[in-house]
Amino acid sequence: MAYKIRLGGTNEFVSAIDPHAPHCYPPGEVKFVEGWSNPAAIIFLTKTSAERAKDKVWEIEGFHTTIEEML
């Protein structure tokens, strides 16, 4: 099973997580792309890695996200 992280209630998915982005204050940046089938969205191969990334998105941006199973 593979997983994507979706911005709560939207069709936007995490495409990049940079916890050290220097141009942001506080440091850190999360980027999103639109579309369930967008190839730029990050695909996590384990639920554990998706959960860690979800926690990092919360830590950086404070956004509510969900982990979506990809069939």
Predicted region positions:
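Short aromatic-glycine-(Arg/Gly/Cys) micro-motifs in beta-strand/loop hairpins
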Residues: 1-40, 67
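Short, mixed-charge low-complexity intrinsically disordered segments
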Residues: 38-71
